[in-house]
């Protein structure tokens, strides 16, 4: 008769099951971390599970830095801190640490230490496994959680297509900015010039977009209330200092745009923004072109003087043709004073 087979497991990942183990997850982790092995542990995950008869079990995944050869069946035994009791586990080498991690995650009562190490078996299983991985990512609720899931369950796609995956998740999980709340109601602006009021009622029409609306350029000194008035007319895009038409900032459902303190010499898409055409594209610096629904007017706010005034910009000799076009597609107003009376307005917004 052949001698009994000697116990030996040589693996990088270990799956341990402790039946009828009364230790807490924290107590078990503390003891496991004190095991002396020639290769260091990189990740430990513990799940406490109650069986139907009420007996507690512990499931443990240990990932080592390199392969560890275990020849002692009692090496992973745990000891009760309150009574003379040892807890001996069933010991297995984990061929797929991702599968073991998913298994012990199922009950939710888990504790972890270290950083999970991705294994090459994570994405095995063909198209259905890939679909499951991407479904889990979409259901995760955030870009960061989705990336963690794909890094573990679809490592090949994660490494090969990270740029595209990251860009797509930005679009999927980008939350629209909260609606702007103007501290001053529109009725508090009691010195609005008639021409400005007429422009508002003729061109800002909500979702029912006018056919080729006219934009408006409002030039005036600082603290005249032009920014606050412009932002009190309805849902809008507010772009200050520079033009950012990325989905994180620009909302295609806005009623109008407000462009504040942007040097006209560096205003990209001058005609498209002034003229209000529908459906045009803009190239973003680090992403794919974005589709702009258009068909809405724009309020341009500026101060007098070079590098700010649109009038002075259009009066430059080289811009004579652009000026002729702009005068047909926009109204130009110079403010003579504040758009409100009294001191109840308080400080006005400054870009």
From Swiss-Prot:
Entry annotation: catalytic residues: 103
Cofactor section: Mg(2+); Mn(2+)
Binding site for ATP: 220-227
Cofactor note: Divalent metal cations, possibly Mg(2+) or Mn(2+).
InterPro entries per the UniProt record, alphabetical: CRESS_DNA_REP, Gemini_AL1_CLV, Gemini_AL1_REP, Gemini_AL1_REP_central
Position of sequence motif RCR-2: 57-59
Region (Oligomerization): 156-176
Localization: Host nucleus
One GO-annotated biological process of the protein: DNA replication
Annotated residues for binding of a divalent metal cation: 49, 57, 59, 107
Motif RCR-1, chain ranges: 15-18
Protein family per UniProt: Belongs to the geminiviridae Rep protein family.
Designated name of the protein: Replication-associated protein
């Amino acid at each position: 008769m052949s001698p009994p087979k000697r116990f030996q497991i040589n693996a990088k990942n270990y799956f341990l099951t402790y039946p009828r183990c009364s230790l807490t997850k924290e107590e078990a982790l503390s003891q496991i971390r004190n095991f002396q092995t020639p290769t260091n542990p990189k990740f430990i995950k513990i799940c406490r599970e109650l069986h139907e008869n009420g007996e507690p079990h512990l499931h443990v995944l240990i990932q080592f830095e390199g392969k560890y050869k275990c020849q002692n069946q009692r090496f992973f035994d745990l000891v009760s801190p309150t009574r003379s009791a040892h807890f001996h586990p069933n010991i297995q080498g984990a061929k797929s640490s991702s599968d073991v991690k998913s298994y012990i995650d199922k009950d939710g009562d888990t504790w972890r230490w270290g950083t999970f190490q991705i294994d090459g078996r994570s994405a095995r299983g063909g198209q259905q496994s890939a679909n499951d991985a991407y479904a889990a990512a979409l259901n995760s609720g955030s870009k960061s959680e989705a990336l963690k899931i794909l890094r573990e369950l679809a490592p090949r796609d994660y490494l090969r297509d990270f740029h595209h995956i990251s860009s797509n998740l930005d679009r999927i999980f980008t939350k629209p900015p909260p609606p702007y709340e103007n501290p001053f109601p529109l009725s508090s602006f009691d010195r609005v010039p008639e021409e400005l009021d007429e422009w508002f009622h003729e061109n800002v029409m909500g979702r029912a977009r006018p056919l080729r609306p006219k934009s408006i350029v409002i030039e005036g000194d600082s603290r005249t209330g032009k920014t606050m008035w412009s932002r009190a007319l309805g849902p809008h895009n507010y772009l200050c200092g520079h033009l950012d038409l990325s989905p994180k900032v620009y909302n295609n459902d806005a009623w109008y745009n407000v462009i504040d303190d942007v040097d006209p010499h560096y205003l990209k898409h001058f005609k498209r923004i002034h003229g209000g055409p529908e459906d045009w594209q803009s190239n973003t610096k680090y992403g794919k072109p974005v589709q702009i629904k258009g068909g809405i007017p724009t309020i341009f706010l500026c101060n007098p003087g070079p590098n700010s005034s649109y009038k002075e910009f259009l009066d430059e000799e080289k811009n004579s043709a652009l000026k002729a076009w702009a005068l047909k597609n926009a109204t130009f107003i110079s403010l003579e004073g504040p758009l409100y009376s009294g001191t109840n307005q308080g400080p006005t917004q400054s870009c």
